[in-house]
A protein has these predicted regions:
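Exported/periplasmic ABC-transporter solute-binding proteins
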Residues: 1-176
Length: 177
């Protein structure tokens, strides 16, 4: 939903419109998780950035960018503003909202340096496993074979099923999709 615009038409699925409210309440079922992937031994600054993402401020940024925040009652950010560099790598779907989170975090913690490397979910998970990055980004759940790391869902992304604006189709069933 974060990329939906007026150049295309989103169709209803099982009668439910593709809206953030409908994804959040479960009536629109075409959605995926936006996960960050970490492993044990995260640096203080990386832990603090994760805390920011999961805070009320971070969750509000997620919502302002068209995604569904995970924690409606998240606590305010109360970080210690540690110093250091964080490398975040992975999903090109998660990357745009991660750039916004980075920008907001750097405004409150000028001691941090964050590099975002955009690729795909598998590379994000693998890079985290191998210690190439501190935080991986994945627009899917972890596979059973992706071990030694932990996924934390930071947002839900509603996936709009779209057609050309001139197409008369207004509604599809889950089976049709």
């Amino acid at each position: 939903l974060g990329s939906l615009n007026d150049t295309v038409k989103a169709v209803k699925i099982d009668g439910a419109e593709a809206t953030t409210d409908n994804v959040a309440n479960g009536t629109y079922k075409v959605a995926r998780p936006f996960n960050i992937v970490t492993k044990d031994g995260l640096s203080d600054v990386a832990k603090d950035f994760v805390d920011y993402i999961m805070s009320a401020e971070g969750q509000d940024i997620i919502e302002q960018n068209g995604y569904i925040k995970i924690d409606q009652n998240a606590a305010a950010y109360a970080g210690s503003k540690p110093e250091g560099k964080i490398v975040v790598a992975g999903s090109s779907s998660v990357s745009p909202v991660m750039e916004k989170l980075k920008e907001a975090y750097l405004a409150v913690n000028t001691n941090a340096d964050i590099e975002i490397q955009t690729s795909d979910s598998t590379t994000g998970v693998t890079s985290t496993q191998e210690g190439i990055c501190d935080i991986g980004m994945a627009s899917r759940d972890l596979k059973d074979t992706e071990t030694g790391v932990t996924a934390t869902t930071i947002a839900q992304d509603g996936i709009a099923v779209i057609v050309n604006n001139e197409n008369p189709v207004e509604n599809l069933t889950s089976d049709q999709v």
